[in-house]
């Protein structure tokens, strides 16, 4: 799964937001969210596949932490799209002001 597909789901975005607060487990996330531990694990798996989280196994516990590097692709894309729309709006304003 690519970064954009992973971020396309609002629940995954919320899981990622919570993981960004510091390393955590699926069990802890499930206690904080209105979804089951199995659902949290499914979303964490998708985020892991997209490279957005890192899994660290310690005994029986699996902790997840944020990997921010892939988000630079998102920031770059959003910046490009934003510039394109700014230019289009400036062109429209120019035409309307004539």
Which stretches of residues belong to each language-model region?
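Amphipathic alpha-helical dimerization/coiled-coil segments
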Residues: 17, 72-98
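Short, hydrophobic-biased segments on the C-terminal half of alpha helices
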Residues: 44-45
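Acidic side chains
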Residues: 1-2, 9, 48, 86, ...
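N-terminal helix-turn-helix DNA-binding core of bacterial DNA-binding proteins
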Residues: 1-36, 58-72
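Alpha-helical residues within the helix-turn-helix
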Residues: 31, 48-49
């Amino acid at each position: 799964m690519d970064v954009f597909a992973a971020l396309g789901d609002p629940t995954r975005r919320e899981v990622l937001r919570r993981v960004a607060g510091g390393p955590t487990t699926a069990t802890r996330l499930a206690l904080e969210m209105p979804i089951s531990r199995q659902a949290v694990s499914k979303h964490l798996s998708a985020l892991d596949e997209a490279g957005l989280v890192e899994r660290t196994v310690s005994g029986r516990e699996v902790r997840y932490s944020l990997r921010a590097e892939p988000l630079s692709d998102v920031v770059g894309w959003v910046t490009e799209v934003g510039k394109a729309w700014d230019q289009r709006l400036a062109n429209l304003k120019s035409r309307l002001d004539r």
